[in-house]
Amino acid sequence: MARYVFITGGVVSSLGKGIAAAALAALLQARGYRVRIRKLDPYLNVDPGTMSPYQHGEVFVTDDGAETDLDLGHYERFTGRPANQQDNITTGRIYRNIIEKERRGDYLGATVQVIPHVTDEIKNFVLEGNEDYDFVLCEIGGTVGDIEAMPFLEAIRQLGNELPRGTAVYIHLTLMPYIPAAGELKTKPTQHSVKELRSIGIAPDILLVRADREIPESDRRKLSLFCNVRESAVIQALDVATIYDVPIAYHKEGLDSEVLSAFGIDPAPKPRMDRWEEVSHRLHNPEGEVTIAVVGKYTGLKDAYKSLIEALHHGGLANKVKVNLDWIEAEVFESEDPAPYLEKVHGILVPGGFGERGAEGKILAAKFARERKVPYFGICFGMQMACIEAARNLVGIEDASSSEFGPTREPVVGLMTEWLKGNMLEKRAAAGDLGGTMRLGAYEAVLKPDSKIAQIYGSTDIHERHRHRYEVNIDYKDRLEAAGLNFAGMSPDGVLPETVEYADHPWFIGVQYHPELKSRPFEPHPLFASFIEAAIEQSRLV
């Protein structure tokens, strides 16, 4: 039977509930337990697919094509377990399901209400499909006190009563701010947050307290007294240098032991922390460093590229180097010469994105990398812009563009309407709902045996995750290849270009998919490991 850990947050948002959940899951895994993590998001959107990156950050795509919260990326990276559509629910999906049931008559004429219908739908989501797991961790998005979160908090309160005794534990993540004028940490915000949570009917078993300095024993006793938790269950969560130090830090503070104790599991299997210690050692003891320019559209909010950032650091781990990121807004290159920005970097990465803004700047970045022989990694939109650059400057198609930017006589990049998914042909209407017109999830690609990318993968058959509406137009393939841009990877039916590369360039690869979504600290994605390796070689030339 699965045991449930419900993780809530208080005082302020962005405390790191997702990292906390992922770290705890990793610690339980290290003890040999089978763990699943689920995210409950209170917003009314059906999924984050159409939300602005500045509002939400990255949209993390799973193998089965779900557009989910970026925390699921942390879950995958920390546990190695691929997430799926059933690991993330939103208020929007809950209400959509309920309205569909009401229209079908499933409620037999009953008045549909938040309690019991909404809360029952949430509980069903939490409990479904957990037969193969020892622990299920449920992170509740938002902050205690948010009106949007009330149905979710009520649902997990009910579950605490309905589940067998001893199979549900509540962890509350809070903040102890330091007040310089007083020269001390303050417990009152945490006390009020717990009071709010208790007023809903949830009594936390464990307090995980964020702080930027050691919490005095007197403050721990104070929190224990006023929040009605054991003193040993007041766990300090101090700031650490990297997110991959969090599992080690939480283990030293006794979080995993306290959770197991709350479930009455004693003695518990000892954890194996060696691989986390190895990752931490490599991060803190690099043998060199490289600088990668990320020429993007949403550089004002780094969370928009969360998986990309982590994958680059994984590439650094594979090569035992520190990876420094130089963030460049692509629009800058539309009014300024790229050379002063790019001459000192050791690699250029143009990530995915949507829309015309910044496109010309990304094209200029691809041109600089091609002409100066600087390692270039184009992902999704970055591959498309590299193809447009080649069409303009190598093939001589001056009007080469993308139909995403408006009508064009030379659509080197165009809207997809159909593609193969396994043996089935999937179709999308261009006029359909914005959230349902993309190629989403894991798809197969076939690589040329003699290509550089096949050598990097060590295989000619790969499966990678996609999130795009537009694709390089195969009608331009022959002319681009004649000019030197090799279409090294194609969809199994040979219709959709998946990867491109230059044979005469040290490292210039574009991919239509998002390899960053499958990178792990213990298993760096081969493309990122190879890209950083090429950047190391470039660093010796700069």
Curated annotation (Swiss-Prot):
Family: Belongs to the CTP synthase family.
Residues binding L-glutamine, per UniProt: Y54, G353, F381, G382, M383, Q384, E404, R469
UniProt record, GO biological process: 'de novo' CTP biosynthetic process; pyrimidine nucleobase biosynthetic process
Protein name: CTP synthase
A Gene Ontology molecular function term of the record: CTP synthase activity
Organism: Brucella abortus (strain 2308)
GO cellular component, one term: cytosol
Keyword Ligase: yes
Additional information: CTPSs have evolved a hybrid strategy for distinguishing between UTP and CTP. The overlapping regions of the product feedback inhibitory and substrate sites recognize a common feature in both compounds, the triphosphate moiety. To differentiate isosteric substrate and product pyrimidine rings, an additional pocket far from the expected kinase/ligase catalytic site, specifically recognizes the cytosine and ribose portions of the product inhibitor.
Catalytic site positions: C380, H514, E516
Enzyme class: ligase
Signal peptide interval: none
Region Amidoligase domain: start-end pairs: 1-265
Chain positions recorded as ATP binding sites: S14, L15, G16, K17, G18, I19, D71
Segments passing through the bilayer: none
EC number: 6.3.4.2
Domain of life assignment: Bacteria
Chain positions recorded as UTP binding sites: S13, K186, T187, K188, P189, T190, Q191, K222
Keywords: ATP-binding, Glutamine amidotransferase, Ligase, Magnesium, Metal-binding, Nucleotide-binding, Pyrimidine biosynthesis
Glutamine amidotransferase type-1 domain boundaries: 291-541
UniProt binding sites for Mg(2+): D71, E139
